[in-house]
Amino acid sequence: MKSGRLFTRTCCLLGFLLSTACGSRTEKASPDYPEFKMIVRLWPDHHKDSALREELLQALKKYPDFCDEVWLCMEFETFSKEAHKESARAMAVAAERLRNAGIGVSIQGITLGHGDDFESGAARPHPELTWGNIVDARNVRTVTSSCPRQQAFHDYLGETYALYAGLCRPSCVWLDDDLRVTYHAPARQLCFCDTCLSLFNRQHGEHWTRETLVEALDRNEGEGRLRRQWISFCQQSLAEVARTVARAVHEVSPGTRMGLQHANFHRELMEGRDWNPTLDALEEETGLAPASRPGNGFYDDHAPRGMLLKGYDMARQIRRLKPSVREIAAEVEGYRHRATGKSPHGLCVESMFYLAMGATQLSYAIICAASEPMQWYADNYFKSLSAWRPFYEQYVAFNRGTEPGGIDPYIGPDHALRDTEAGEPSLAWIATGAGDMIYDMATLGLPFCPDGNHSSALIMDASAVQGLARD
């Protein structure tokens, strides 16, 4: 299925990188550190299908060292209130069974929607979706993804999340990484609908249309002022969605924390520099420090070096978190969760690398689609990860107060404000590949620390230098 020789070389390389990852120690003010957890992420069938639920419980009991907590999943292919009510009732039953087995319970759910070709499997309209959809800069409109500034959408989210949280009383409610500015297919970015344009104009005393706003953003109107305003507006659009959910959850389950699943989207400059506006909203509404789940991509290990890209990207996202965000549950993903996707040993090595990059916990999306029999998942994935757990626990304890050391592939904080060059297409400034050369260089054994606070040197390619003009 894969080259054993290549995978062995990759594991040896990771061993060297891990040995350098703890080179910089940063003692933190508080002696309190989050509890190490190994978490299993699920999909709705794991609580709705009683047979599958029982198979999962038996598998977790067979390997008790593997899993501390599960994330039960809200419905993501419907806006129907009745469908959500039925699912929430089944989820409450599953939550009780899991807690009785000594396993913690949290919940994850979507907000805006990943895109027309993701949740529903087809770009078909939902009759219950009565509010506005996302419209991008090219006037491309989604069918199933929601504009974040629609009041009816906020009402729906608050009611739906409160339903699940009230019945299940989860430890944490996690917002999926569809709460983002870019890539809600077919829309490239959000949101240039009439509602968003009207609110943006009112906020800044302007009269932009979609066309004139895009033109002004491209020519960098106000020497970066307009881009800053638009990026901030988009970030606040997401933050208000998070605020609505957090407020609704907190009202029915005051002890429930909030968490944000965020992709490694530092290349997408319209996302903003970090996720702090959203994380701040979660904390303001609950009074509790939010949790982070960084990471995306590397869905199979057919090309094992892909974990370097994901891990180093994750390191950059982790460095940009506020110190108060201490629970950092790295994504270990195997979509579509087939035996031919990732090997058990590959999962173990991948998990170790993400801990070295600064994660404090591990979240596994490796059985969601139930593509294999539960017994196969248990006797391969659960068994192998259980065997590695003592090593993970020792490493996390040793790694406290450290961060990756080495060379920082620097990306300036104002990269989004660079002037576009002749011949570049519209909105070329919203994305960058700056620093991507390190993924090949890392295979030589060079240690890197993206956004590191104690780097031994900086390295920049031409794209990174282009973004320095306004630093």
Model-flagged regions — what are they?
Residues 40-49, 75-86, 139-155, 223-239, ...:
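The substrate-binding groove and active-site-proximal loops of carbohydrate-active enzymes
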Residues 51-77, 167-170, 351-361, 440, ...:
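Catalytic domains of carbohydrate-active enzymes, especially glycoside hydrolases
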Residues 167, 191-258:
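Active-site neighborhood of glycoside hydrolase catalytic domains
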Residues 107-168, 185, 205-231:
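Active-site-adjacent "subsite" loops/lids of carbohydrate-active enzymes
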Residues 426-471:
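Helical hinge/lid and interdomain linker segments adjacent to catalytic or ligand-binding clefts
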Residues 21-110, 142-144, 151, 155, ...:
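Mature N-terminal, pre-catalytic/accessory segment of carbohydrate-active enzymes
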Residues 63, 118, 171, 182-183, ...:
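Hydrophobic targeting/anchoring helices
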Residues 36-46, 106-110, 174-177, 229-273, ...:
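Aromatic-lined carbohydrate-recognition surfaces of secreted/lumenal glycan-active proteins
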